């Protein structure tokens, strides 16, 4: 078995993901977004806020300015799922030009399960130890026998492009794979999902680590809006408009008024006499006495003013 590079993340029994190179990061995203009026930012917090705005409103082009290039090694059946993401540039190990290597994927016992009765593309349930051992034995037997025949044909001078056809899809291949951040996040969103096949999920999770390291603000925004955020259909929104009591909306709006006030005060500290009028300006309804009790509790969290105001508008549109 060939050695896994020291700077790579091992995936499955013999595979890996290695970040070869990257171009740009969070700074490249904001640079591209601001080019229309040629103005930079002086604060890191402003860069973070802009990236979050871009992600929230799905302005994808600035994220395409960041590039990642990986060296990956995976079973062929994983590569065939992977290659469906057609925006990438790929150069794969050629079995027409080069000889195959005796490297085959054999699943660990804990990942051998039954076919799911609910998901035609999934697995479920607990398999007996005897059956797990039999599955592993079959994997090894077919792998060994197919490679033995392949080697025999190869030694007899049969064309490699033909001899390779008898090799099973658990044979390992490798490639260089390059993509931009926007499409890489789309890949991760699909392939790190709990419904994705385990064997490709481990590669996606490994790639996610490098994204988090290279573009931490973009990764944070992706987690907040793409992974953990919710979007409602027209039908779902109509249900909310009819069923969500106004008193619940008013309570949330009141919390937002406090959060906006706290955020504005954090960004630009005000005197004590200015804080309550600032809160009232944000639509707050509490009396000055009640406001002071809540404000002095220290439990009010700051956020992003733009996000909070957009959320406020959405909530107000739901009021009956």
Residue ranges and their predicted role:
Residues 1-320:
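Family-specific signature for flavin-dependent thymidylate synthase
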């Amino acid at each position: 078995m060939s050695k896994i590079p020291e700077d790579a993340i091992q995936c499955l029994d013999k595979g890996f993901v290695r970040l070869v190179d990257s171009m740009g990061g969070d700074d490249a995203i904001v640079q591209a977004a601001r080019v229309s009026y040629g103005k930079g930012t002086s604060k890191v917090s402003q860069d973070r806020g802009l990236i979050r705005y871009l992600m929230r409103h799905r302005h994808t082009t600035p994220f395409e300015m960041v590039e990642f290039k990986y060296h990956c090694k995976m079973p062929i059946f994983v590569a065939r799922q992977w290659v469906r993401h057609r925006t990438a540039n790929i150069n794969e190990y050629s079995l027409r030009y080069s000889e195959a290597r005796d490297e085959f994927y054999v699943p660990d016992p804990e990942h051998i399960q039954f076919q799911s009765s609910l998901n035609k593309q999934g697995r479920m349930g607990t398999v007996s130890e005897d059956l797990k051992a039999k599955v592993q034995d079959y994997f090894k037997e077919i792998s060994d026998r197919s490679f033995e025949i392949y080697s025999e044909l190869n030694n007899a001078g049969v064309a490699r492009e033909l001899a390779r056809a008898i090799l099973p899809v658990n044979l390992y291949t490798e490639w260089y794979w390059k993509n931009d951040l926007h499409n890489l996040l789309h890949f991760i969103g699909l392939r790190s999902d709990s419904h994705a096949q385990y064997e490709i999920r481990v590669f996606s999770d490994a790639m996610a680590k490098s994204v988090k390291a290279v573009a931490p603000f973009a990764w944070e925004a992706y987690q907040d809006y793409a992974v953990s955020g919710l979007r409602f259909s027209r039908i779902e929104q109509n249900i909310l408009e009819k069923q969500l009591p106004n008193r619940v909306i008013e309570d949330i709006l009141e919390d937002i008024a406090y959060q906006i006030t706290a955020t504005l005060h954090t960004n630009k500290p005000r005197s004590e006499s200015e804080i309550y009028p600032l809160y009232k300006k944000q639509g707050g309804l509490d009396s000055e006495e009640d406001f002071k009790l809540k404000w002095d509790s220290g439990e009010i969290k700051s956020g992003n003013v733009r996000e909070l105001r957009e959320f406020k508008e959405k909530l107000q549109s739901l009021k009956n």
